[in-house]
């Protein structure tokens, strides 16, 4: 199974998020389910940039961003979570987990702690220890407070490196090189979660 995003139709189409499923090792894919789409109550441009992770109980958790609006103060929308307890056939109504965020990334470690990384502003981490994705704690900002609005795209990548640790990669627009000149740089940090 994989996830994707797409736009609806009509005069003001909004983003939606969907699951595709393959039963032939990825040679062909078919529509499996809608995670979230074109909610009439969603004030921005819909749900996009989905990330899906298998939770310790076997359920699926999806993290979704909402597309930012066109107003100057709407640079990013709310970050949402949705859950499936039937292999991704049906999904709960998305619920807000953070008032902002782009490109959410979920990662379950072998110690069953689930990491949620997201950005804009900044690069942020949240941690779930209940195994169900209900309670999140430990909001951590990985860039300097004064740089969180202008010095990173906020897009990240996560990879587990052990039962209680992972690498996070993210960009910084003006990281000083060996001569002190600001350069766009990809940074990687190891994080240990116990």
Name every feature range the model reports, one short phrase each.
Residues 1-194:
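Asp-box/BNR beta-propeller blade signature and adjacent active/binding-site loops
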């Amino acid at each position: 199974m994989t996830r994707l995003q797409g736009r609806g139709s009509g005069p003001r189409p909004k983003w939606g998020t969907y699951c595709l499923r393959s039963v032939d090792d990825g040679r062909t894919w078919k529509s499996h389910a809608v995670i979230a789409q074109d909610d009439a109550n969603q004030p921005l441009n819909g749900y996009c940039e989905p990330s899906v992770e298998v939770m310790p109980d076997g359920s699926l958790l999806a993290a979704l961003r909402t597309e930012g609006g066109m107003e100057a103060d709407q640079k990013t929308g709310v970050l949402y979570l949705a859950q499936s307890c039937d292999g991704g056939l049906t999904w709960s109504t998305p619920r807000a987990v953070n008032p902002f965020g782009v490109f959410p990334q979920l990662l379950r470690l072998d110690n069953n702690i689930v990491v949620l990384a997201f950005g804009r502003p900044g690069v942020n981490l949240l941690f779930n220890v209940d195994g169900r994705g209900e309670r999140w704690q430990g909001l951590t900002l990985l860039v300097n407070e004064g740089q969180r609005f202008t010095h990173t795209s906020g897009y990240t990548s996560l990879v587990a490196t052990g039962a209680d640790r992972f690498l996070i990669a993210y960009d910084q627009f003006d990281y000083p090189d060996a001569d002190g000149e600001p350069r766009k740089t990809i940074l990687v940090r190891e994080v240990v979660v116990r």
